[in-house]
Amino acid sequence: AIDPARLSVTVYKDDDEAAKIWNEKIGIPTSRISRLEEDENFWPASAPSQGPDGVCGPCSEIYYQLDSGKTVEIWNLVFTQFNRVGDPPDNLRPLPSKNIDTGMG
């Protein structure tokens, strides 16, 4: 079984909804929720500022701490909710239908 006390997560820096769900619904303490920049927690990386144009969204990643203290990514979620069109500002257009793309590691 996976020990929940060994889990930590990352969210995109502005994704208050994901952080709240991890904390309030799943029970991950805020001390184990890291908010990262778009180069780390947005798909494709740095899409808001650098592109490419197309479907994109913030990410959340789940990590497990091994006995050695090392952490490994065990799962990721991409909240596909925008279409990037052109350069900032105002270049992220909400998609009419949003989805969550998930994957292991």
Which residues are covered by each model-predicted region?
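Structured aminoacyl-transfer and RNA-binding surfaces used for tRNA recognition/handling
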Residues: A1-M104
